[in-house]
Amino acid sequence: MNEELSAFFDVPVGTMMLAIAFPAILLPTPNRLITNRWITIQQWLVKLIMKQLLSIHNTKGLSWSLMLITLTLFIGLTNLLGLLPYSFAPTAQLTVNLSMAIPLWTGTVILGFRYKTKISLAHLLPQGTPTFLIPMIIIIETISLLIRPVTLAVRLTANITAGHLLIHLTGTAALTLLSIHSMTITVTFITVVVLTILELAVALIQAYVFALLISLYLHESA
């Protein structure tokens, strides 16, 4: 059992690359004017995501719509991919999530200091701060700014990993209890089904939360 759990985190690079590229297959670019139902659902989903993520932005901020929509769909589909039997979710790896969070966060910081230099610096010192607390507050606000990409990546990794491990442990318990009593396996099976449904919701919610936080960071900067 311990070997199975450790194998969950020890994934070959080739397998990870295939898992990352898989969402592109599920969302093909339509090459004709008359679309089918799948393309219609895809377009409706894109419009819904755009409406939710870009409601706080002005006209200038709308230029980030393609990136935010792509980010949401990519994370959501890779999270759902990990729920399939004998599959792997790239977002369960902290390195993958950091590789998304750090460049996006860096871009928001650069934009902020380029276009809103005074406002970006003002965020490091809240208005009305007592004089003797100014050095400490600046250090605290700077640290809170620098750990943003880490919190983004850790939040996504922790939620996806915890759900997968919980389902794995519950499923293993169901197989172990199978030889004890039939009623026990029934209760455990129902528990696994409920956990899977909850994990479906978590997979989609975490994709939305990740993209929403990036959108909020962009709103502060752009």
From Swiss-Prot:
Location within or outside the cell: Mitochondrion inner membrane
Does the record's keyword annotation contain Aminoacyl-tRNA synthetase? no
Keyword annotations of the record: ATP synthesis, CF(0), Extinct organism protein, Hydrogen ion transport, Ion transport, Membrane, Mitochondrion, Mitochondrion inner membrane, Transmembrane, Transmembrane helix, Transport
The reply to whether Transmembrane figures as a keyword in the UniProt entry is yes
**Mode of membrane association:** Multi-pass membrane protein
* Annotated GO CC locations: mitochondrial inner membrane; proton-transporting ATP synthase complex
Q: Which Pfam families match?
A: ATP-synt_A
GO biological process assignments:
proton motive force-driven ATP synthesis; proton transmembrane transport
A GO molecular function annotation here is: proton-transporting ATP synthase activity, rotational mechanism
Please write the reaction equations for the catalytic activity of this protein: H(+)(in) = H(+)(out)
Transmembrane parts of this sequence: 7-27, 64-84, 93-113, 132-152, 160-180, 185-205
- Could you tell me which InterPro entries the record lists for this protein? ATP_synth_F0_asu, ATP_synth_F0_asu_AS, ATP_synth_F0_asu_bact/mt, F0_ATP_A_sf
Q: How does it assemble?
A: Component of the ATP synthase complex composed at least of ATP5F1A/subunit alpha, ATP5F1B/subunit beta, ATP5MC1/subunit c (homooctomer), MT-ATP6/subunit a, MT-ATP8/subunit 8, ATP5ME/subunit e, ATP5MF/subunit f, ATP5MG/subunit g, ATP5MK/subunit k, ATP5MJ/subunit j, ATP5F1C/subunit gamma, ATP5F1D/subunit delta, ATP5F1E/subunit epsilon, ATP5PF/subunit F6, ATP5PB/subunit b, ATP5PD/subunit d, ATP5PO/subunit OSCP.
Q: What does this protein do?
A: Subunit a, of the mitochondrial membrane ATP synthase complex (F(1)F(0) ATP synthase or Complex V) that produces ATP from ADP in the presence of a proton gradient across the membrane which is generated by electron transport complexes of the respiratory chain. ATP synthase complex consist of a soluble F(1) head domain - the catalytic core - and a membrane F(1) domain - the membrane proton channel. These two domains are linked by a central stalk rotating inside the F(1) region and a stationary peripheral stalk.
The UniProt similarity line reads: Belongs to the ATPase A chain family.
| Protein name according to UniProt | ATP synthase F(0) complex subunit a
Q: Can you name the source organism?
A: Mammuthus primigenius (Siberian woolly mammoth)
Give the organism's phylogenetic lineage: Eukaryota, Metazoa, Chordata, Craniata, Vertebrata
